[in-house]
Amino acid sequence: MAGKRSGWSRAALLQLLLGANLMVMPPTQARSLRFVTLLYRHGDRSPVKTYPKDPYQEEEWPQGFGQLTKEGMLQHWELGQALRQRYHGFLNTSYHRQEVYVRSTDFDRTLMSAEANLAGLFPPNGMQRFNPNISWQPIPVHTVPITEDRLLKFPLGPCPRYEQLQNETRKTPEYQNESSRNAQFLDMVANETGLTDLTLETVWNVYDTLFCEQTHGLHLPPWASPQTMQRLSRLKDFSFRFLFGIYQQAEKARLQGGVLLAQIRRNLTLMATTSQLPKLLVYSAHDTTLVALQMALDVYNGEQAPYASCHIFELYQEDSGNFSVEMYFRNESDKAPWPLSLPGCPHRCPLQDFLHLTEPVVPKDWQQECQLASGPADTEVIVALAVCGSILFLLIVLLLTVLFRMQAQPPGYRHVADGEDHA
């Protein structure tokens, strides 16, 4: 309970600090953009893995499995160019380290995507060119080891309560119906691929492999017809909802995407009160990262985030001095980003409303909330063990007492029966 009270007090302190700052802040001349957070998926890549009967194994791909392709590099360079145009006048036209901070998961494809993106966002100008023949400059991308990443690599674990929720999700009518409807289809796919452990939760790997091969001009096997690919795609999208929704979505969010959302909320609050962060904060990650965050925000469209798709948070200071948050999702390269509205708030969402509406899906103490609560059955077991332990303890004490008394009798002493002759 102490951890919970301290969590609520921190949230209340953020609200109080923000409110006090807004009361004393003088009005600005015009509405202005103050801070941007980007979360994007890596670009086009090779398959993460293959299946036993696949004629195309790892050697088919120049850099092996799970690696960014030239197409993926171009996708992120183009996204960087689009961001450069969108934030012209907000960001300096040349790279300034005080303005930008980039963090990536520790995967080759996300690190390289961030580097390609920065090449499009900040081509070197003038003195920044270290070679006149190279229109590129090194810009730092920060990361942590995969095993230590508690911000961008989802699903987060180990988390016993989340695993319990997943087991409960498997018992829901929606999951059970989906499983029964696709039982024969999964058997067919398992037979064609040579996979022995194919389930609703793992079939996305088959779709991913076939999709990557098709994208790169490789011929698919006859069984992978357009109808089969469409069905696999739908099951792939179902697997994302299984991870972060279907059942107890809000609690799953607290254990998953809400962790990242908590950091984004802190950054927005900090920039509205002290302006002590870079103007642009970038996260380079995965489709699961985007889905986890968008499910926590309740703005997920139910489909896998495309390569180089980008979720945008923009913090504005209004002419009144108050702050607002706008969200966008760029999931098509040839169109402007789609406006996203947090449920219960207009697209131009006042910052305090944004914080209030997202509070329920932000964990107060992730480690504590991940623990399993003791139910009635657990209590009965504990009581029974305690009773048995007490009885065993008393028996041991009684036995030791008897043994002690027997050993305490003097040598040669024996009881004399009535009527026995004395020597």
Curated annotation (Swiss-Prot):
Its EC number is 3.1.3.2. One of its GO terms (cellular component) is lysosomal lumen. CDD domains: HP_HAP_like. Disulfide bonds join C159-C370, C212-C310, C345-C349. The active site is at H42 (nucleophile), D287 (proton donor). Residues 402-423 are cytoplasmic. This is Lysosomal acid phosphatase. It comes from Macaca fascicularis (Crab-eating macaque). The gene is ACP2.
